[in-house]
Design a protein with these regions (language model features):
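Short, C-terminally biased terminal segments at protein or domain edges
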Residues: 1-53, 57-145
Length: 145
């Protein structure tokens, strides 16, 4: 079990992907500095950051929400890489590597989201039971029967 978001293979893969995006976009035309270059870099950082932020949230529901945001940013990357490819931007090998890392990241995010989703009904039931028990206990303590 992971003790930190840094232990998650999906987070590690996302950092690797982001570095690949930075290396790829170094070769983009200078006029793309505030276009595809900026968009790809920001989306890569967003994927890794959302995984980390979700890890630090209070509930698994919030964590899943941030994983969904990470997945959305990863989809942006895939779209932007396709556009860059069609425009002939970047080294083809670096482009292929970034595409592969993005697809792997996407699969890993979906897998992690499914794992969390399968645990949510159980956690909800446990939380409801604890809430009901605490209400009964408070009623008894304060004679609120």
């Amino acid at each position: 079990m992971a003790n930190s978001y840094r232990d998650l293979i999906v987070w590690q893969r996302t950092v690797e992907m982001t570095l690949a995006l930075y290396r790829l976009t170094e070769e983009f035309p200078k006029q793309e500095m505030f276009g595809l270059t900026s968009q790809l870099r920001r989306a890569g950082v967003s994927v890794a950051s959302n995984i980390a932020e979700g890890w630090g949230r209070q509930s698994e529901g919030e964590y899943k929400h941030f994983l969904g945001m990470a997945r959305g940013s990863n989809m942006e990357i895939q779209t932007q890489l396709l556009i860059a490819s069609k425009l002939g931007f970047g080294d083809p090998e670096k482009l292929t590597l970034a595409e592969q890392l993005s697809h792997e990241t996407g699969k890993m995010l979906v897998s992690l989201m499914k794992k969390i989703r399968s645990r949510l009904p159980f956690l909800f039931a446990v939380n409801c039971s604890l809430f009901a028990a605490s209400q009964y206990s408070l009623g008894y303590i304060f004679d609120m029967r």
